[in-house]
From Swiss-Prot:
Name used for this protein in its record: Cytochrome b6
Gene of this entry: petB
Species, as recorded: Zygnema circumcarinatum
Membrane topology type: Multi-pass membrane protein
Record has Plastid as a keyword: yes
Positions that bind heme b 1: H100, H202
Lineage of the organism: Eukaryota, Viridiplantae, Streptophyta, Zygnematophyceae, Zygnematophycidae
CDD domains noted in UniProt: Cytochrome_b_N (cd00284)
Residues reported to bind heme c: C35
Length: 215
């Protein structure tokens, strides 16, 4: 094992990378409330894992979506647990994100030179809420259907561009298969990818600038 490690160490300098990660200075004022962002990340990872597991059984069609969710809950081994953990971690992610925003705002973590870190955090907040909106519709039950109809109908009140925005969100004038397909694509591919990119940017900036000081 030693020779294998030495081979990789010679080429990748693993030890120097590990030393840089583990030797980062942590200010003495940091407490448990500074862990809220990390907890949000943990919830996101759980979301990805459990969501990926459910894609093996979920069918994104208006005729089969609800039945496939019922199948996951009743027939798939531990399917009820996987979906429940997905729902619980989704709620926890939103809660931790809100608390994290409050902590950053109250401690002045958004001030110079961390403005861009705050901007990426706000974008992550919007993406998190978008996860909730798109995921809520996927079972395609009465609650999900009417929630989508109401949410996608809100832009219709905007003059001139309202109707095109509604059609863009729904895929047509009315809510139907194209709407479910778009929401499924957003929920399982577009939003996770964007969230991963902005989380990486967010953490790299925190890594570069360090944790903000006390008030």
């Amino acid at each position: 094992m030693g020779k294998v490690y030495d081979w990789f160490e010679e080429r990748l300098e693993i030890q120097s990378i590990a030393d840089d990660i583990t030797s980062k200075y942590v200010p003495p004022h940091v407490n448990i409330f500074y862990c809220l962002g990390g907890i949000t990340l943990t919830c996101f990872i759980i979301q990805v894992a459990t969501g990926f597991a459910m894609t093996f059984y979920y069918r994104p069609t208006v005729t089969e979506a609800f039945a496939s969710v019922q199948y996951i809950m009743t027939d798939v081994n531990f399917g009820w647990l996987i979906r429940s953990v997905h729902r619980w971690s989704a709620s926890m992610m939103v809660l931790m994100m809100i608390l994290h925003v409050f902590r950053v705002y109250l401690t002045g973590g958004f001030k110079k030179p961390r403005e861009l870190t705050w901007v990426t955090g706000v974008i992550l907040g919007v993406l998190t809420v978008s996860f909730g909106v798109t995921g809520y519709s996927l079972p395609w039950d009465q609650i999900g259907y009417w929630a989508v109809k109401i949410v996608t109908g809100v832009p219709d009140a905007i003059p001139v561009v309202g109707s095109p925005i509604v059609e863009l969100l729904r895929g047509s004038v009315s809510v139907g298969q194209t709407t479910l397909t778009r929401f499924y694509s957003l929920h399982t591919f577009v939003l996770p990818l964007l969230t991963a990119v902005f989380m990486l940017m967010h953490f790299l900036m925190i890594r570069k600038q360090g944790i903000s000081g006390p008030l």
